[in-house]
Every structure is written in structure tokens, then in C-alpha cells.
Amino acid sequence: PNIESRFFSSLAKNLEQRCRAEGYALFITNSDGLPENDLDLLALLVTRGVDGIFLVVADELADDSVLVDELSHLPVPYVMIDRVVDNLSCDKVLFDHEQGGYMATKYLLEKGHERIACMVNAAKSMTGRKRLAGYERALTEAGVAFDPSLVVETDYYISDAYEASANVLDTDATAVFASSDNIALGLLKRLYQ
């Protein structure tokens, strides 16, 4: 992932504090969300003799066979966080992204909105696709037809979301489900101008 993400920087901060409290130093590497960097960084950490690894892989690597092979032979314990390989037997910390998208959309529906735009990174992100699925499930459950013209594709960076949010303003949406904090910040920046 990219350490500039509010989610991942907060995760890193909390992991570092907990490790320090337990007498460990946390070394952080940043793949910039590029799958090719994850495997190199994993090898670097093992070479440096770390005691264990908290691993958050790039979205595109979650089902990568090379990654599965590398992790199957990793000589140190590891915990996968957020983005995991389903068929890999290891400790995992998961977030239910589909349920999160569902709950956010259901909240907006309960407030009386039916034309709800969804700003999401579904094209490049498994996490985004799961959040979009939750959005669609909430609409279907409420009897509201899914309208693909209300789905606005964006990356997880504030600047990208700011640019993409112009497309939201071109719709008749009365509410927006922004599928990440950075996407919400980009949207808010647009709305405040």
C-alpha cells in the first residue's frame, strides 16, 4: 500500500506503538501500492533478519501465485492485514469492506436518499470492488435500482478524488457514498469550492 493513505499511516502508527510497548522496533517499508515492490520488500525484510512481519500487500497481489509460494516458504512468522490471500493458511486481520459499503449506503437510504452516487476505486482495487458490492446490495435490498451512471471511478488519492468529484456534480445524486477517507476528502474539497 501507499503510506500516504490515512488508513495505512494510522495502521502503521498504531502497530509501531504496540510493538514498542512489547519491546520490539517496527521497520516500515512502503510499496507505493505497486505489486512488483511487495515481493522485493518482503525479501529485504527477511534478509535483514526481522523477527516477524505484518504484511499488507498491494491489492493486485492478493491472489498472486508467486506471492503465495513466497509466503508458504517464509522463514519468519507473519500476519496478513486487510488484503489477504484467501487460500493461504496464516494469521489474518480482516476488515469487512462489503459490509462497510452496505452500511454506509443503507444509512443514506434510511435518511431518504435514493439517488446515491458512489465514488470508488473498483477498477484497480479488490477493496473497492467489495465496497461497491455492498453499495449495490443495500440499493437492491431497499428496492432502489442500481444506476451505473452514479458510480464514479477514482483512485484513493485526494487529488484524484477531487478531479473525479466533478463527475458527481454532473449527476442528480442527493447523497454520495465516498468509499474511503481520502476519496471523501477530495469530494469535500470540491464541494467547498
Regions found by a protein language model. Name each.
Residues D51-V57:
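Short beta-strand-loop elements within alpha/beta enzyme cores
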Residues N14-A25, A43-G49, A62-Q193:
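Bacterial carbohydrate/catabolite-sensing allosteric modules
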Residues P1, S31, A58, R83-V84:
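Beta-hairpin (beta-strand-turn-beta-strand) motif
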Residues L26-N30:
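Short beta-strand->loop structural element characteristic of the AMP-binding/adenylate-forming
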Residues P1-Q17:
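N-terminal winged-helix
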Residues D32-P35, A58-A62, N182:
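Short beta->alpha connector loops
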Residues E36-D40:
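Conserved ATP-dependent adenylate/AMP-binding module captured primarily in the ANL superfamily
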